[in-house]
Amino acid sequence: MNSMILGGCIPSPKKQTEPITVEKNPNMMYMLVGSYATPDEEGIKVYNFDEQTGNSQYISGIKGISNPSFLIPSADGKRIYTVGEDAGKSSTANAIKFDKEQKKLTLLNSQPTDGGAPCYITLSPSEKFVLTANYMGGSITVFPLDKDGKLKSETRLISFTGNSLDKERQTQPHLHCIKFTPDHKYLLASDLGTDQIHVFPVSENVTDGVSHSLLNESEEFNIKVESGSGPRHICFHPNQKFAYLINEISGKVIAFSYDKGKLNAIQYIE
C-alpha cells in the first residue's frame, strides 16, 4: 500500500462527511493522519491523496483511542499500529485493521505500554514485533504480535537512566524515536533527556512471540551527541551510508556516516 503518514495534528472541529469512493487513479495514495484527540473523536483519519494535484478526500476514521499521535502501517497496508499518548498508566499501543475494500478502520486490540507518553511506534523488520518509545516513561516497550496482527500482552520493557545539561527538559531520559537500521541489524533509540542514541544489536536468534528475544540488550552501546542537543528523530539516506538527527533543544541537525551500527558525526547544521 502506498501511504503517507501525518501525526500530531489537531482534530478538526467540523463533523466529517460519509466515506467517499473515488475513481481509481495511478497517482492516488492513502494518507493516514494521527492526532491528539479524545476517545470520542476520530483520532485517526484516512484520506485519498493525489500525488500529482495535492488534493485529498476524506475516506473514513476511527474513534476509541486517546491521543493517537503517531502511527505506522504494515507493509501490506492491512494493519495500522498507533500509540495512545497519555501521560501515565493509561498509555497504550493499538492495533487497527484497515479494510481497503470497505474503506473501514477497525480497532483489533490495545495493550498498555507500561511507560508514559509513548510518542513513536515502529514495526520490526520481520513485522512480528511492535515497539514504542515512551517519552515520559524513559523506556522502550516491545510487543510480540499474534498471527492476526494483534498485540500480545507478554511485553518487554527496557528502561534507561541519566540526565543532561538542560535543567528543565533533561532531568531524566526521554525516549523520542526508535528506528531500525537499513541493514536490519540494529535498533537506534534517540533519547532527548540524556543526549544519547542508544544502540541495540538485533538478535540472530529471535523467537516468535518472545519479546525479550528481539534485541541483544547486554550488547547495548551509546552514541553521545553535544550536551543540550535534545535528540528527537533520526532517518537514513536512501544509500544507507548516512543518517540525519534533528535535535529539539539546540535546533541543530547532525549528519552522520553509518557503518555496522556505528554513527560518526560529520556535520552539525545550525
What are these regions (language model features)?
Residues 1-24:
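Bacterial Sec-dependent N-terminal signal peptides
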Residues 19-49:
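An edge-strand/N-cap motif at the start of beta-rich repeat modules
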Residues 36-38, 85-87, 135, 145, ...:
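Short loop/turn segments immediately following the C-termini of beta-strands
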Residues 40, 65-76, 114-125, 129, ...:
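Beta-rich, blade/repeat-based domains predominating
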Residues 48-54, 96-103, 143-152, 201-214, ...:
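Short loop/turn segments immediately following beta-strands, especially the blade-tip
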Residues 57-63, 106-111, 162-168, 218-224, ...:
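A short beta-strand motif characteristic of beta-propeller blades
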Residues 58-127:
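Blade-loop segments of beta-propeller domains
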